[in-house]
Amino acid sequence: AATKYPVGVVAPGAIGHDINVGVRLLGSSVNADLSADQIDTLADTLHEHIPTGSEAEGSLQLTKSEVDHVAQSGAQWALRKDLAQQDDLVRAEEGGRLNDADPSKVSDAARALGAKQLGTLGGGEHFIEINVVEEVFNRAAALTMGLKENTLVAQIHCGSRGYGRQICADYIERFQAVASKHDIDPPSPGLAAVPLDSSEAEDYMGAMCAAANFAYANRQVLAHRVREAFNEVLDGQGEAFHTVYDVAHNLGQIEMHQVEGRHIRCYVHRKGAARAFGPGTPGISLPYRALGQPVLVPGSMGEASWVLLAKRESMEISFGSACHGAGRTMSRHEVSHQGAVSPVDEELEAQDVSIRSGG
């Protein structure tokens, strides 16, 4: 959804609790012909290196001041800590950092969660997958991305963890308290909103960008852990993994778009959507500016994922946005009332997929 800036509203619930949940894709030159034992050892090692589960805590225990540094710097913080390569940032959306972050607008409750959760995957639909490049349709684009058939890639899907969730909860509560002042009656309490030109909106956007930077740093640390695991299992081949792209899903951003023939400054809410800027659009990482922004579409478990490129038409059709995944056949609420579910681990093992989970 998009509104003309600064006429519209901002709603934290419309951006989502998991601010800047997104996907980092790592490509490699590592041949996919691994033995079953190597695959199992790799799965075990990844699980040991990367804390999983909704309450997971990482090895990077930070002070509240350090959390603010992460929130201000994003993936650049990881580069300074030798947890990143320069090219990781070059091939990340916005260089892995939003400039408008304001950690002073973040609560101590959120900081406390961020202090113990950087470098953790989380639970629910968050995942790290090791995949194989099965088929290439555009060889020139694949060459730019460093993708080659029958090589290994890694997908990292996670976000800002409890830090971002607490920020969203804090601002939904705050916006509910001032709704009458702004004469805004949302369709549900979770969609509490304020005008974009209000002080409350300015505070939220500073905090949201802080959470986005935390998420960029989190995916970067996890990429480093993936490299460490491959170094351990495959004799140093972790260094063969490079960032193809890192794309955000749940964000609100100020962008220029053409509407009815006029260039309009818009505030674009992307919830469960990825940015998809067409070729030549400012803001695309330099390696991809001529091609169009990469769009990473993870498939359902056991199904294929896709690496796509945005076309110019996306700017006209969807404010430069695209789907962010395979989608759902039913909601989380419906699933919770479904009763017995199929044994997913058995189904995946039947497809020679090795799975590890942490709750």
Language-model segments: which ranges?
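Domain-length cofactor-binding catalytic modules of enzymes
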Residues: 1, 5-14, 20, 37-359
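Acidic/polar active-site rim loop that often engages polyanionic ligands
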Residues: 21-29
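Patatin-like phospholipase
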Residues: 32
